[in-house]
Amino acid sequence: MDWRLRKDGERLIGTPVGRVDEDSWRDFSAHLNAAVRDALAAQLPLVLDLSELEFMTSKGLRALTMAKKQAAGAVTITLAGPNLTMRRILSISRYDMLFPVVDDVDPTG
């Protein structure tokens, strides 16, 4: 799992690449926590670009839960561009009820 973070206008975009599984969830969690800290410090929303994420286990979902708690309502975390597999995971786990999920990172669609 690789991670990229960039500022795009008035938001931060974090992009996990590959799979978040038993071997990589700790790295994902560390990158995500750092991105939330950066978003809090800059007072910017955080968009997770899931378009390059193939799969996520329950440990990755737990990392999302912890990031939401860390954000404490001060930062909005949006999940963008999930593939069909990730959409199913988010739906089955009901994470699509916890986080805004949008089709594309580009706010204009």
Please describe what each predicted stretch is.
Residues M1-T15:
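Short beta-strand/loop segment at the start of cytosolic alpha/beta domains
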Residues D8, V17-R19, P82, D104:
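Generic beta-structure capping elements
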Residues V20-F99:
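Amphipathic alpha-helical interaction surfaces in cytosolic regulatory modules
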Residues P100-T108:
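Short acidic-hydrophobic, aromatic-tinged amphipathic segments that line or gate anion-handling sites
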